Regions:
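Positively charged, low-complexity intrinsically disordered leader regions
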Residues: 1-23
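Structural motif
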Residues: 1-3, 102, 130-131, 180
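Hydrophobic/aromatic residues located in beta-strands of well-ordered beta-sheets
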Residues: 2, 54-56, 161
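Short beta-strand segments
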Residues: 4-7, 58-59, 84, 94-96, ...
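Short glycine-enriched loops at secondary-structure junctions
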Residues: 7-12, 85-90, 167
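Substrate-binding N-lobe of the ribokinase-like
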Residues: 28-88
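Conserved phosphate-binding/catalytic loop of the ribokinase/pfkB sugar-kinase fold
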Residues: 94-128
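Conserved beta-alpha-beta core of the PfkB/ribokinase-like small-molecule kinase fold
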Residues: 131-181
Length: 181
């Protein structure tokens, strides 16, 4: 089984503005799209398109977390495993106007020890030869070495780790001993 882990999921809100962005003015949009995502969840989406099942572990909270979870509910190839967090998942806004874009990413909630433990409990359920993809950014509150600890927990189960993250150092990446980066 392939597991994907998304430590900082988001709702991406795309809007096309009718005119140039005006500061201190009301700007009107003509087209809006909401997409549930996060890098690990996007990996699960691609796997699903290829008809490959996956289990998507995602840290979710608030109405935004519920929206993200609901967005994957009807996909038969993705089993969503929500990890509860206090607060709301972030909303990232992308406003396109002309040939320019304004991108604003929310920060999201801060994880606590309970969230970390729920996540480690899910990792304890994986089997040998499973593949665990850790992808994207981390919410505030995760320890700097959390991904290393997560990778070590995966290795203890004789499973493979794939890492696609910007927030870890090369030294941490080496400690994770990834199967693929």
């Amino acid at each position: 089984m392939i597991y994907t882990i998304t430590l900082n999921p988001a709702i991406d809100y795309f809007i096309t503005l009718n005119e140039t962005l005006l500061v201190d003015e009301v700007n009107r949009g003509s087209h809006e799209i909401y997409k549930a995502g996060g890098k690990g969840l996007n990996v699960s989406k691609i796997l699903s398109v290829l008809n490959i099942p996956s289990k998507a572990i995602a840290v979710l909270g608030g109405f935004t977390g519920q929206y993200i979870e609901d967005s994957f509910a009807k996909d038969p190839n993705i089993e969503m495993i929500p990890i509860p967090v206090d607060g709301m998942n972030r909303i990232n806004m992308k406003a396109n106007y002309g040939k320019k874009a304004l991108c604003i990413n929310g920060s999201g909630p801060v994880v606590n020890d309970c969230t970390v433990q729920f996540l480690l409990d899910e990792i304890a359920k994986i089997n040998a030869d499973d593949i665990v993809v850790i992808s994207g950014s981390m919410m505030h509150g995760f320890a700097d070495d959390f991904v290393t600890a997560l990778a070590q927990a995966v290795h203890q189960k004789n499973a493979k780790v794939v890492i696609d993250m910007e927030q870890i150092t090369m030294e941490q990446l080496k400690e994770c001993k990834p199967y693929l980066i």
